[in-house]
């Protein structure tokens, strides 16, 4: 196999962030591998540029793929360089992200190997992870009432037909608990989250979703249930082996689902969504720091992320 290019000149509007069990997308043509350094450091993996041929139109569309936990799963949840990941993707043109995550189920109806398209998040991280691009002399407040992009969610939900297997269900909505980790929940915590109305639990959504919103990127997570966490009286408590076994058994479904979503997103009717036209300017107009008072460091970093957005003039 020829070496991949280390540059790619065309804008790439769509990205997939792979998590546990989804570290690559087979049947896509790899054309480039980009090593990008951002003001927040390097991302967790090189960004692979894939050419995706839409099954309906035959159109070839570039898609960026980034491995959240690194090529060899070397980043713990609290160590993932989320700011660098989101910044690097935006720098190559990405304006829409489909993120994948294994999750524990907090509800009987969400069985292992079911899929969930969450619409809400409860943040149970502990402030260890940097969660904003605005600091050190720049303050902005961006809305996060609906943490996922509803337009993206509609596209994802419409692709549930790609799922196969007896009893595999796509749940259209759900509240995702994002915990700190890397240890799994205590039984008391698991039951507490259930009492709050939590549907599923992971360690990856925050700050990824918050940073995507600040970066004006349409973001939707696709979750695959692998276990019942530790609340279920008749099911074994979650272990890494359990998670990976269910991921392996359902890997074809996961990849087919992602492929179906990419097929749909590459249609011309979704061009405005893919470029997140509905989010343009939300960050710029969320800035609270008075003009002329951005610190030099903050201005340098923000100008890298948003060329032409901010100035001290």
Swiss-Prot record:
PROSITE patterns: PNP_MTAP_2
Enzyme class: transferase
Annotated positions binding substrate: 203, 227-229
Keywords from the UniProt entry: Cytoplasm, Glycosyltransferase, Nucleus, Purine salvage, Transferase
Site annotation Important for substrate specificity: residues: 185, 240
Subcellular location(s) of the protein: Cytoplasm; Nucleus
Functional pathway: Amino-acid biosynthesis; L-methionine biosynthesis via salvage pathway; S-methyl-5-thio-alpha-D-ribose 1-phosphate from S-methyl-5'-thioadenosine (phosphorylase route): step 1/1
Catalytic activity: S-methyl-5'-thioadenosine + phosphate = 5-(methylsulfanyl)-alpha-D-ribose 1-phosphate + adenine
Gene Ontology terms: biological process: L-methionine salvage from methylthioadenosine; purine ribonucleoside salvage
GO MF annotation terms: S-methyl-5-thioadenosine phosphorylase activity
Sequence positions that bind phosphate: 20, 68-69, 101-102, 204
Pfam families noted in UniProt: PNP_UDP_1 (PF01048)
Main location: cytoplasm
EC nos: 2.4.2.28
Entries under PANTHER family matching the protein: S-METHYL-5'-THIOADENOSINE PHOSPHORYLASE
NCBIfam families: MTAP (TIGR01694)
Function as written in the Swiss-Prot or TrEMBL entry: Catalyzes the reversible phosphorylation of S-methyl-5'-thioadenosine (MTA) to adenine and 5-methylthioribose-1-phosphate. Involved in the breakdown of MTA, a major by-product of polyamine biosynthesis. Responsible for the first step in the methionine salvage pathway after MTA has been generated from S-adenosylmethionine. Has broad substrate specificity with 6-aminopurine nucleosides as preferred substrates.
Homology family: Belongs to the PNP/MTAP phosphorylase family. MTAP subfamily.
Description of how the protein assembles with itself and partners: Homotrimer.
HAMAP family xref list: MTAP
Full protein name: S-methyl-5'-thioadenosine phosphorylase
Taxonomic placement: Eukaryota, Fungi, Dikarya, Ascomycota, Pezizomycotina
């Amino acid at each position: 196999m020829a070496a991949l290019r280390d540059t790619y000149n065309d804008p790439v509007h769509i990205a997939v962030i792979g998590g546990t069990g989804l570290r690559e997308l087979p049947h896509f043509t790899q054309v480039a591998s980009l090593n990008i350094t951002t003001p927040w450091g390097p991302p967790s993996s090189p960004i692979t540029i894939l050419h995706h041929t839409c099954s309906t139109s035959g159109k070839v569309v570039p898609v960026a793929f980034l491995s959240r936990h690194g090529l060899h799963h070397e980043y713990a949840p609290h160590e993932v360089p989320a700011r660098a990941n989101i910044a690097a993707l935006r720098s190559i043109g990405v304006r829409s992200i489909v993120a994948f995550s294994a999750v524990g189920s907090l509800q009987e109806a969400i069985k292992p190997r079911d899929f969930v398209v969450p619409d809400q998040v409860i943040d149970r991280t502990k402030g260890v992870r940097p969660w904003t691009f605005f600091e050190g002399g720049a303050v902005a407040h961006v809305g996060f009432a609906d943490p996922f992009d509803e337009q993206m969610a509609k596209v994802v939900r419409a692709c549930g037909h790609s799922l196969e297997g007896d009893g595999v269900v796509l749940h259209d909505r759900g509240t995702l608990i994002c915990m700190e980790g890397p240890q799994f929940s205590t039984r008391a915590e698991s039951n507490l989250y259930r009492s709050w109305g939590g549907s599923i639990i992971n360690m990856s959504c925050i700050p990824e979703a918050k940073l995507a919103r600040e970066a004006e990127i349409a973001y939707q997570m696709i979750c695959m249930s692998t276990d019942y966490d530790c609340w279920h009286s008749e099911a074994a408590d979650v272990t890494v082996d359990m998670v990976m076994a269910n991921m392996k058994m359902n890997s074809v479904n996961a990849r087919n689902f992602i492929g179906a979503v990419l097929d749909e997103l590459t249609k011309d009717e979704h061009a405005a969504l893919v470029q997140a036209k509905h989010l343009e300017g939300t960050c710029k107009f969320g800035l609270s720091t008075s003009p002329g008072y951005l610190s030099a460091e903050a201005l340098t970093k923000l100008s890298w992320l948003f060329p032409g957005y901010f100035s001290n003039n």
